[in-house]
């Protein structure tokens, strides 16, 4: 059948949870047997989020095909089985860049390039292309209705609604209905004005999802329906909940999926949410708890480590444990010492870039090694564990990464200096190269050493994990580090690059160059995080 489109916009304020709402609806539709995908359209001018500050933008989520994308794509993959690709996320900057590139090549035959039709046509083509082959495509428009940056995207989806007709296009508007304490009531006026703004550009929402800190009374839903020209049963109340994984059931209880299927004339089975019921059961019935310290430098914005946070929670579900995450600024370890690590059941050092706070991360790895505390290093977290071991065990006292000290006499971690590009040509990469689009990215195979801890964790000889990094373990130091007792138990497909290290004299000390957090889901978990949380619980019991 022809793809049906559900366009999701937001109003009043940003960060209302459009991505979670879209992903939750997608999960219900998928549970009805439909083939579903989700696209995210970002209005900012950056070509992609790859070089944006994690403190401003949150984490950069990496897809299987190596696209650096918005963190909402992580939500999408955690809620539905469909794997996201580079087609599932694009920015206004990417659109303008490509349109201007075609203009320079003369592809517009000298025409004056305008937002309408050239920019909007490019947006529409990307949406159609990204949705191809699916029963339903949800399209989330970043930002808020009324933002200048969002106007080309809103115009594009307005045109799409006209082109494909009401039987294939449905508009959902997510809005805020605040509760005013002194007045003792919810206020619908912001929602009314937000819908008025949306209608002024030619889009009439079919469904309103109203965010509030409480369930909306039926009389307020009726009032909103009256003033926004939306069916009363299509005004959905979405109150705050203590777990985002409750939202699919919450939306289903208000027949949101039924409304969508009726609108699209879809005769499909009822949604079976038994997998989500199992997730909620595991979440609400823990048998214990562990405290894991996450040592990083972007801790003022937890969304900078969004997928790691979620992966730890998923591992807690599989172990029937509540995972309490304590964020520790790595710079504090440099200035105040490591006493803040003493009460932890495990230590995790996630990825990152730049030299700020690196010595604190090295101290965290040293503390975990010396005190037999379970340690999981991810990307930079592996590199600092390697540097620490080289300095304090292998005798390479000046060991470092060339990212932090280009003149190090023992550069145990170094820049990727050449590889093949997509056309099979050799490219040179050094410290003078552009930062954007110059990394080892996406899903790659890794061979595991039989008999190693990580082999036992995965239960497989070969795995596929996603990468996002420029620097690698320097193979010139591998033999010396192995003689000092460090184990290199995961190698790239061609056996030339180190992917995983282990400390064989430690109960659980594993560090990986890749990012396992990107493939963890609440329904399936991830073996590396599950093993890590289980080790934290064992350490807790042994220490008590």
Curated annotation (Swiss-Prot):
Residue sites binding ATP per the record: 15-20, 72
Catalytic activity: UTP + L-glutamine + ATP + H2O = CTP + L-glutamate + ADP + phosphate + 2 H(+); L-glutamine + H2O = L-glutamate + NH4(+); UTP + NH4(+) + ATP = CTP + ADP + phosphate + 2 H(+)
Active-site positions on this chain: 379, 515, 517
EC number: 6.3.4.2
Top-rank lineage group of the source organism: Bacteria
Residues noted as binding L-glutamine in the record, renumbered to the chain: 352, 380-383, 403, 470
Function text: Catalyzes the ATP-dependent amination of UTP to CTP with either L-glutamine or ammonia as the source of nitrogen. Regulates intracellular CTP levels through interactions with the four ribonucleotide triphosphates.
The protein, known as: CTP synthase
Phylogenetic placement of the source organism: Bacteria, Pseudomonadati, Pseudomonadota, Gammaproteobacteria, Alteromonadales
């Amino acid at each position: 059948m022809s793809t049906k489109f559900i366009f999701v916009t937001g109003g009043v304020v940003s960060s209302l949870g459009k991505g979670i709402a879209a992903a939750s609806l997608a999960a219900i539709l998928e549970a009805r047997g439909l083939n579903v995908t989700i696209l995210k359209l970002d209005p900012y001018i950056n070509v992609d989020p790859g070089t944006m500050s994690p403190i401003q933008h949150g984490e950069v989520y990496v897809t299987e095909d190596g696209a650096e994308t918005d963190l909402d794509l992580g939500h999408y993959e955690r809620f539905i089985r469909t794997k996201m690709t580079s087609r599932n996320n694009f920015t206004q900057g990417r659109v303008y860049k490509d349109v201007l590139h075609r203009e320079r090549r003369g592809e517009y035959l000298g025409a004056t390039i305008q937002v309408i039709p050239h920019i909007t046509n490019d947006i529409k083509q990307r949406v159609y292309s990204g949705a191809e082959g699916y029963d339903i495509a949800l399209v989330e428009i970043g930002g808020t209705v009324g933002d200048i940056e969002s106007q080309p995207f809103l115009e594009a989806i307005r045109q799409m609604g006209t082109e494909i007709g009401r039987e294939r296009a449905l508009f959902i508007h997510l809005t805020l209905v605040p509760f005013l304490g002194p007045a003792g009531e919810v206020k619908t006026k912001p929602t009314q004005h937000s819908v008025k703004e949306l209608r002024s550009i030619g889009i009439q929402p079919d469904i309103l999802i109203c965010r509030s800190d409480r369930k909306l009374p039926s009389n307020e839903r009726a009032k909103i329906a009256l003033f926004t020209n939306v069916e009363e049963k299509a005004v959905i109340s979405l109150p705050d909940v203590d777990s985002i994984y409750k939202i699919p059931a919450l939306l289903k209880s208000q027949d949101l999926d039924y409304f969508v299927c009726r609108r699209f004339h879809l005769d499909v089975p009822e949604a079976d949410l038994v997998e989500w019921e199992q997730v909620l059961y595991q979440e609400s019935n823990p048998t214990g708890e562990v405290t894991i310290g996450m040592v990083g430098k972007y801790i003022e914005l937890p969304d900078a480590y969004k997928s790691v946070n979620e992966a730890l929670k998923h591992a807690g579900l599989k172990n029937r444990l509540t995972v309490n995450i304590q964020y520790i600024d790595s710079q504090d370890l440099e200035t105040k010492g490591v006493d803040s690590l003493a009460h932890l059941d495990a230590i995790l050092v996630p990825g990152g870039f730049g030299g700020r706070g690196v010595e604190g991360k090295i101290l965290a790895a040293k503390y975990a090694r010396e005190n037999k505390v379970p340690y999981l290093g991810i990307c930079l977290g592996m590199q600092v564990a390697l540097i620490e071991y080289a300095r304090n065990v292998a005798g390479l006292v000046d060991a470092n990464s060339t990212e932090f000290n280009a003149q190090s006499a023992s550069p145990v971690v170094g820049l990727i200096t050449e590889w093949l590009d997509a056309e099979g040509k050799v490219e040179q990469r050094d410290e003078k190269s552009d930062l954007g689009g110059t990394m080892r990215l996406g899903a790659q195979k890794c061979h595991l050493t039989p008999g190693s801890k990580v082999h036992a964790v995965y239960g497989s000889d070969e795995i596929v994990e996603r990468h996002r990094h420029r620097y690698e373990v320097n193979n010139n130091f591998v033999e010396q580090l192995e003689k000092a007792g460090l184990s290199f138990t995961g190698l790239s497909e061609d056996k030339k690059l180190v992917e995983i290290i282990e400390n064989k004299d430690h109960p659980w000390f594993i560090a990986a160059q890749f990012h396992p957090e990107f493939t963890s889901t609440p329904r399936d978990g991830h073996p590396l995080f599950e093993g890590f949380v289980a080790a934290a619980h064992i350490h807790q019991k042994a220490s008590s």
